[in-house]
């Protein structure tokens, strides 16, 4: 069900909108984490390392597709808030057609160049073939990833954050059983996890389309989905390019960090894989609160309600702060039990606990940076989110390299480099926020 966010009490609205987003993304992360948990327990740390190495690579390419969806969803939210159904329909059809073509081309390119990508990443020869196979299978499912994210982001732009949650719950459950079947029963190793993931993504996409056909008349497939508006595509790319580059910048930074980690040995790579999964769970609610702020601000921006935009920003930042404190306590206190979910190797667990004790103290900083980025996305100024993310990731890699290679701090170097990156990001964002906020 769609929701008009231009009226009503803002704090309850943000909370109610955010909860399904959080649950949906946690389920999505769950079926990603299940791959790591199952291969870590039933195959070994080599397979766990292979899955972990592929994660930032596949995410980088997926985020290019998500950037297109993000740019479109901002415009869709604006047109929906302005009650302009004609432009809304043209926007949706143009985005879907362009995204399908782009995702298919990207799939072919990525599958062909997978070995070259992994060689550039300096992947250990002992796990190279295993990693290549996993990566190519995941790339084969990019078109399903795009379609689901497009329909889900469109529903959220219209105020419906619950329906995508239900599809992800079903998909996550199917993926868990699929992983167990392929890995435990068929002994297919990391390749089996990849196959299960692609099947789950395809089913999730199918559920989303069937729901829209039956329950959302505004989005039902038909002749209107064959309309291609080049002027709207240019505007979508203008928004989506900045969003895609911002997210790609984050992933390029993660790739840089992953390349540094790959030099530390399989045990550290396996530990980093596990803590990255935990980090994803920790950061996701912060990002979802920001996405709720974006949806609220985009609709109210389209409706010309500036005061509600200011109030929405303040409410969102309060939620970010509360969550930042909560997740610090959880990850600091339960660091070892969390690591034991992924692996039983004591050396790997030790590295992971060291990382979590340091990084959890800093979780409050990305809570603030995510909230600020939610504000700028909502008003359509995505260049600022790109610049601040570029500062963050550049500082991370620049600080991490000497801490690892010169001071030999090992995995402890990474949280310190993240801290430097987040501080740099805040320094880039705050002056622009203060200047922009005064105009609303």
Describe each region flagged by the PLM:
Residues 1-18, 76-141, 185-241, 297-362, ...:
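Short alpha-helical transmembrane segments in multi-pass integral membrane proteins
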Residues 5-42, 56-71, 75, 100-107, ...:
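N-terminal transmembrane alpha-helices
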Residues 16-35, 137, 171, 200-204, ...:
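Transmembrane helical elements of multi-pass membrane transporters/channels
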Residues 21, 25, 37, 74, ...:
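Transmembrane alpha-helix boundary and packing residues in multipass membrane permease domains
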Residues 26, 30-49, 118-125, 181-188, ...:
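Helix-terminus/linker motif at the lipid-water interface of multi-pass membrane proteins
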Residues 45-56, 135, 194, 266-281, ...:
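Small-residue hotspots at the loop-to-helix junctions and early N-terminal turns
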Residues 48-108, 145-164, 271-335, 366-380, ...:
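Small-residue-rich hydrophobic transmembrane alpha-helices
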Residues 69, 137-156, 164-172, 193-206, ...:
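Short runs within selected transmembrane alpha-helices of multi-pass transporters and secretion channels
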């Amino acid at each position: 069900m769609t929701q008009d966010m231009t009226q009503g009490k803002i704090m309850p609205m943000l909370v109610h909108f955010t909860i399904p987003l959080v649950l949906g993304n946690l389920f999505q992360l769950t079926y990603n984490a299940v791959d790591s948990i199952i291969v870590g327990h039933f195959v070994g740390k080599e397979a766990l390392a292979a899955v972990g190495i592929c994660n930032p690579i596949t995410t980088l390419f997926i985020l290019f597709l998500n950037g297109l969806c993000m740019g479109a969803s901002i415009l869709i939210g604006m047109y929906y808030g302005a009650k302009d159904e004609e432009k809304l329909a043209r926007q949706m059809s143009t985005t879907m057609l362009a995204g399908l073509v782009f995702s298919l081309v990207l799939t072919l390119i990525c599958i062909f160049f997978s070995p070259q990508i992994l060689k550039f990443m300096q992947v250990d020869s002992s796990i190279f073939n295993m990693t290549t196979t996993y990566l190519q299978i995941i790339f084969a499912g990019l078109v399903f990833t795009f379609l689901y994210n497009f329909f889900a982001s469109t529903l959220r732009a219209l105020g419906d954050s619950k329906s995508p949650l239900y599809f992800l719950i079903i998909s996550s459950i199917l993926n868990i059983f699929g992983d167990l079947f392929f890995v435990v029963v068929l002994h297919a190793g990391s390749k089996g996890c990849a196959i299960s993931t692609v099947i789950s993504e395809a089913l999730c996409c199918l559920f989303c389309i069937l729901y829209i056909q039956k329950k959302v008349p505004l989005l039902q497939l038909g002749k209107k989905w064959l309309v291609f508006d080049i002027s709207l595509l240019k505007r979508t790319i203008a928004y989506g390019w900045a969003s895609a580059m911002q997210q790609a910048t984050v992933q390029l930074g993660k790739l840089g960090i992953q390349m540094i980690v790959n030099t530390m040995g399989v045990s550290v790579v396996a530990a980093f894989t596990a803590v990255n999964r935990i980090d994803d769970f920790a950061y996701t609610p912060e990002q979802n609160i920001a996405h709720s702020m974006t949806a609220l601000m985009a609709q109210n921006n389209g409706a010309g309600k500036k005061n509600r935009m200011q109030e929405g920003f303040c409410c969102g930042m309060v939620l970010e702060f509360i969550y930042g404190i909560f997740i610090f306590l959880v990850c600091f206190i339960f660091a070892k039990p969390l690591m034991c979910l992924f692996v039983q190797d004591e050396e790997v667990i030790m590295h992971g606990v060291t990382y979590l004790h340091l990084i959890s103290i800093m979780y409050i900083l990305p809570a603030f940076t995510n909230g600020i980025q939610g504000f700028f996305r909502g008003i359509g100024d995505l260049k600022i989110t790109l610049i601040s993310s570029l500062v963050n990731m550049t500082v991370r890699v620049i600080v991490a390299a000497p801490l690892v290679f010169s001071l030999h701090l090992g995995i402890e170097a990474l949280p310190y480099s993240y801290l430097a990156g987040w501080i740099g990001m805040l320094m880039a964002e705050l002056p622009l926020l203060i200047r922009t906020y005064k105009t609303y």
